[in-house]
């Protein structure tokens, strides 16, 4: 039997999904020892799994190891809600699973740049239609805008010339005697 706090928490999670068009869930805090196969078998108890994405590290020291979360699409909303109610907070090996409605990440433009051209600012309607990566045309516009800014303000972008060679100061001091190995004392 669930406590009142767990019931309220699950109710708030379920109500958050009412605006969802799909039936996609995010499952997090997955123990690294749980395999993709075992997770799919666990999820199939709640309904027909339409799509399952188990994420792995692509590079770095943890390359090939699970990221600790996955996404799952169920065929119906009821199946997804039942999975949230049953799996959220459930202990799986050594960790409690966290199950939530999945939501798309919003593109947050870099605000640190002073003079970003208006052509690169994503509008709210375009941000939903475009994929997360910039198109080739947008990249070309960005490079052209940067070149134009560099032409207008050459002082802002001047740096050391690529062909500058700083010659070391001429040392005219010479040894009074040439270096000989037998002058060195043996150190060990």
UniProtKB/Swiss-Prot annotation:
Region ranges (Disordered): 151-188
UniProt biased composition (Basic residues): 177-188
This protein's record includes keyword Chloroplast: no
Annotated keywords: RNA-binding
InterPro entries linked to this entry: Nucleotide-bd_a/b_plait_sf, RBD_domain_sf, RBM18_RRM, RRM_dom
Protein name: Probable RNA-binding protein 18
Keyword match Disulfide bond: no
Domain RRM: 23-104
Organism: Danio rerio (Zebrafish)
Gene name of the record: rbm18
GO molecular function term, any single one: RNA binding
Gene3D superfamilies noted in UniProt: 3.30.70.330
């Amino acid at each position: 039997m669930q406590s009142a706090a767990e019931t309220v928490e699950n109710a708030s999670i379920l109500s958050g999904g009412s605006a969802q068009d799909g039936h996609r869930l995010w499952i997090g805090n997955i123990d690294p020892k749980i395999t993709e196969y075992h997770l799919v078998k666990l999820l199939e108890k709640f309904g027909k799994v339409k799509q399952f994405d188990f994420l792995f590290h692509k590079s770095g020291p943890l390359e090939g190891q699970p990221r600790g979360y996955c996404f799952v699409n169920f065929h119906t909303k009821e199946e997804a809600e039942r999975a949230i109610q049953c799996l959220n907070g459930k202990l799986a090996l050594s960790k409690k699973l966290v199950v939530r409605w999945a939501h798309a990440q919003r593109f947050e433009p870099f605000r640190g740049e002073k003079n970003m051209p208006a052509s690169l600012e994503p509008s709210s309607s375009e941000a939903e239609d475009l994929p997360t990566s910039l198109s080739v045309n947008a990249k070309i516009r960005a490079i052209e805008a940067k070149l134009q800014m560099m032409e207008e303000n050459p002082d802002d972008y001047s740096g050391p010339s690529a062909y500058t060679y700083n010659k070391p100061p001429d040392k005219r001091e010479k040894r009074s005697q040439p270096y000989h190995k037998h002058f060195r004392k043996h150190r060990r």
